[in-house]
A protein has these predicted regions:
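Conserved structural motif at the start of ABC-family nucleotide-binding domains
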Residues: 15, 29-32
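Conserved ABC ATPase "signature" region
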Residues: 113, 128-148
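Conserved ABC ATPase signature
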Residues: 127, 152-156
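Catalytic Walker B motif of ABC-type/P-loop ATPase nucleotide-binding domains
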Residues: 177-181
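H-loop/switch region of ABC-family ATPase nucleotide-binding domains
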Residues: 212-213
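H-loop (His-switch) and adjacent beta-strand-loop-beta switch element
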Residues: 225-238
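ABC ATPase nucleotide-binding domains
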Residues: 249-270
Length: 270
């Protein structure tokens, strides 16, 4: 079997939230919150710390649940109820938080294979056949990390680890690639390399949701921007109209000057 991006899998919107209320422990995070992420639309969710971005990701991954009431609903890929393992087969998630979840002796290949089960390692009850292993090798080749497959994950550079987490997210050909602050902790060289890879994937048809508080890691291929602040959508629409000095100054409560060059954005003190 040859690994390839299936551009035609998504039949429904990625997520549809209607008038939801969400608590984390005893703290109400979302109240009467609504949002829809559409199929095939590369989207950035941008906001300061504490805006609700992480909560939104946890809803997408079903790590959190809404308060059930008559007027609220949540649908993921058109369905209200999911088997958790089946849902996560539709998603590929890359987050810098995952890097510390793997044991010190985990090899690069094992990190990639764990993507078939959306687990933080491989376990005895998990079965991997020759097709799984071949797909893992193909994705590692695509990302240029095949020669690191037998190295311990803990000994790799941050940039190398992030590429293996990307391979883990892609190996099962998910319908949506979710990037949670993907360049956090990377130096400039690794950051630019990583963004180039993401751009290539989007040009191949990968549907991306990017969650960040940095405008500089928003690739040109992103078309929609959603601004979150204090767990509310304060702006939503075409990226070029949303990512302006005026809107981002209001979002981050300080004067900001936005510069755009070669399709990328840069934020400077206003």
């Amino acid at each position: 079997m040859i690994w390839a991006i299936n551009r035609n899998k998504i039949l429904k919107n990625i997520i549809e939230l209607q008038n939801i209320t969400v608590f984390q422990q005893r703290n109400k995070v979302f109240d009467n919150f609504s949002l829809s992420l559409e199929k095939g639309q590369n989207t950035v969710i941008l906001g300061p710390n504490g805006a609700g971005k992480t909560t939104l990701l946890k809803l997408l991954n079903r790590e959190l649940y809404i308060v059930e009431n008559e007027n609220s609903s949540i649908k993921l890929f058109g369905k209200g109820r999911w088997n958790l393992q089946e849902l996560r087969a539709h998603l590929g998630v890359v987050s810098h938080h995952l890097q510390s979840n793997y044991s010190n002796n985990a090899l690069g290949l094992y990190v990639v294979l764990s993507g078939f089960y959306a687990s933080d390692g491989i376990w005895q009850h998990q079965n991997f056949d020759t097709e799984h292993i071949e797909l893992a090798h193909q994705v590692m080749n695509l990302l240029g990390i095949e020669d690191l497959k037998s190295r311990q994950f803990s000994t790799m550079s941050t940039g190398e680890q992030r590429k293996f987490l990307l391979a883990r997210a892609l190996v099962h050909d998910p319908e949506v690639l979710v990037l949670d602050e993907p360049t956090s902790g990377l130096d400039l060289r690794a950051c630019f390399q990583y963004l180039e890879i993401i751009q290539d994937l989007m040009s191949m048809g990968t549907n991306v949701i990017l969650v960040t508080h940095h405008v500089n890691e928003i690739p040109p291929e992103i078309t929609r921007a959603i601004l979150l602040k204090e767990a509310k959508v304060v702006d939503d629409g075409d990226k070029a109209k949303i990512l302006t000095s005026k809107t981002l100054s209001k979002l981050f409560d300080r004067p900001i000057k936005i510069i755009k060059e070669n399709g990328f954005y840069q934020a400077l003190p206003g």
